[in-house]
A protein has these predicted regions:
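C-terminal "post-core" interaction segments
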Residues: 1-189
Length: 189
């Protein structure tokens, strides 16, 4: 964080992972608010919230695309709906199911859906995805010619949009820091 004015979190092509891991990561960026709730078929609801343990309150932008799914959607939805980050990119995949592996007597396993998750505002994103605040798609040619070493550089068009969005947020914050006629002297100095 030393010297950073803001952050770009890249969740593009992140297929997800563990529910608990996404909650832990969200708690590093959120001081308050709901992160996610899960609802079982029986209607049992479990709400998970931030714990006041955010590592920073500096502005952030999150990059998402159609490859962002499951746990990465939990994280991006929590940051967006708690007004902690702007989402840039393309609509996410839309996997809003909580699954568990059940062991079978022959030693094999079976994946079973045990619940669905909802964003902080109660939105079921399964098969719908999460829409970005700022749409930014790669062209067919750019996707075909893209090299991994260009990720997060000026050759990455979605990253350039994320940087521009972050700069706009930082500029707006600086313009709000000093308001003539206000008692906001500390911010003005």
């Amino acid at each position: 964080e030393q010297g950073a004015q803001g952050y770009v979190l890249d969740l593009r092509s992140n297929p997800g992972g563990l529910l608990e891991a996404s909650i832990d990561i969200a708690r590093q960026w959120l001081n308050e608010g709901t992160i996610v709730s899960t609802r079982t078929r029986e209607g049992i609801r479990d709400v998970r919230r931030a714990t006041g343990s955010a590592i920073t309150d500096k502005p952030m932008v999150v990059l998402i695309d159609q490859g962002s799914a499951s746990a990465s959607e939990i994280l991006s939805g929590a940051l967006q709906e708690n007004k902690r980050a702007q989402l840039v990119g393309q609509k996410t995949f839309g996997k809003g199911l909580v699954q568990a592996v059940r062991g079978l007597s022959d030693g094999s396993g079976m994946t079973v859906t045990i619940a669905k998750y909802l964003t902080p505002n109660g939105t079921d994103i399964h098969k719908n995805g999460i829409k970005p605040d700022v749409e930014a798609a790669m062209s067919e040619k750019e996707m075909r010619d893209f090299k991994i070493e260009n990720l997060g550089t000026s050759k990455d068009s979605q990253y350039r949009v994320a940087e521009t969005t972050l700069i706009k947020v930082l500029t707006m914050q600086k313009n709000e820091a000093y308001r003539p006629g206000s008692a906001n002297l500390e911010a003005a100095l």
